[in-house]
């Protein structure tokens, strides 16, 4: 059985994230969606809230072969813990490759974990958590950028 780890800050989870996660679920026996705590970021939602939001967002996906968790450690340590040989990351056209390639090389060095890149769905590639938060902060419509469940939660968090 091959387990893949799909990490991110997911603050908030976007439809782009959900697309990558569901595609990943079609490719692997089990997918661990891991909310990674990034000390460099100040999240709107706690780790537990993000885990719950992702679980709710994936509930209607038709996928059942996923686990949602969080870690404040290295993703490679999480991979070792669950015996996963691969990390899966989505790539947009905005320079994600350069940033993600560096991390992929570090992850391989640390734990011999490979990184697989899935290109973003062209319809969703302009969406990022940062853009969603910025649009929502300014009263813009984020419908279609995030799962419907996230819209009121984000609006409340930004009040």
From Swiss-Prot:
Signal peptide: none annotated. It comes from Bifidobacterium animalis subsp. lactis (strain AD011). It is an enzyme of class 2 (transferase). GO terms for molecular function: ATP binding; pantetheine-phosphate adenylyltransferase activity. Its main location: cytoplasm. It comes from the Bacteria. It catalyses: (R)-4'-phosphopantetheine + ATP + H(+) = 3'-dephospho-CoA + diphosphate. One of its GO terms (cellular component) is cytoplasm. Pathway: Cofactor biosynthesis; coenzyme A biosynthesis; CoA from (R)-pantothenate: step 4/5. Its cofactor is Mg(2+). One of its GO terms (biological process) is coenzyme A biosynthetic process. Coiled coil: none annotated. This is Phosphopantetheine adenylyltransferase. The gene is coaD. SUPFAM superfamilies: Nucleotidylyl transferase.
């Amino acid at each position: 059985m091959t387990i893949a780890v799909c990490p991110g800050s997911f603050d908030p989870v976007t439809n782009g994230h959900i697309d990558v996660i569901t595609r990943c679920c079609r490719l692997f026996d089990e997918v661990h969606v891991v909310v990674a705590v990034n000390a460099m970021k100040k999240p709107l939602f706690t780790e537990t809230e993000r885990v719950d939001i992702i679980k709710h967002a994936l509930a209607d996906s038709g996928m059942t072969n996923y686990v949602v968790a969080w870690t404040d450690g290295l993703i490679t340590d999480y991979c070792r813990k669950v015996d996963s040989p691969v990390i899966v990351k989505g790539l947009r056209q905005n320079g994600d490759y350069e940033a993600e390639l560096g991390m992929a090389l570090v992850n391989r060095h640390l734990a011999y974990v490979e990184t697989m890149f899935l290109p973003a769905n062209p319809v969703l590639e302009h969406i990022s958590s940062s853009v969603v938060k910025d649009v929502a902060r300014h009263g813009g419509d984020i419908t279609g950028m995030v799962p419907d469940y996230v819209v009121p939660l984000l609006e409340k968090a930004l009040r």
